[in-house]
Amino acid sequence: MRSERPNLFFHAIDAFGGFEPRGDGAPGISIKVLSSDLDTDRKRGSRTRLLRLNPGTSTPEAHAHDYWEEIYMLEGEMTVHEDGQVKTVGPHTYAARKPGVMHGPVSSKTGCLMIDFCWYESGEDK
């Protein structure tokens, strides 16, 4: 399957403005999509986005995705429940999650900014 994502050459990204509330209505969490052809109905494609948690944000419960997810923390701190542990992570930390892996809830006293990569494996990749 050929990607629908456009070719993007290096360009400046505003890491402060232009964020939108996350689609599920989670308060205090906003996103800026950098590139995406992720189609959760057809279970294909990929997405790259910035994800911001405002200071004092917390999510109520654990969740899982049916796609791969990689997160790299750029700034701030976040407390996350994962793999039976509670961890506080900061800048230059990284997570990679296979489809179906439970994670969360999360919270951030200071606020944080992450880059989030999500994708479905194609039939040829499995």
Question: Predicted segment positions?
Answer:
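Short connector loops at helix/strand junctions that flank enzyme active sites
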Residues: I29, R44-T48, D66-W68, M73, ...
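Conserved short histidine dyad/triad with adjacent acidic residue
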Residues: K32-H65, K98-M102
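Short acidic-glycine-tyrosine-enriched beta hairpin
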Residues: D83-G100
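Glycine- and acidic-residue-biased ligand/ion/polar-headgroup-sensing regions
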Residues: P55, A64-D83
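A short, N-terminal "cap"/entry segment at the start of jelly-roll beta-barrel domains
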Residues: M1-G45
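A short hydrophobic beta-strand segment most commonly corresponding to one strand
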Residues: L50, E70, A96-R97, K109-K126
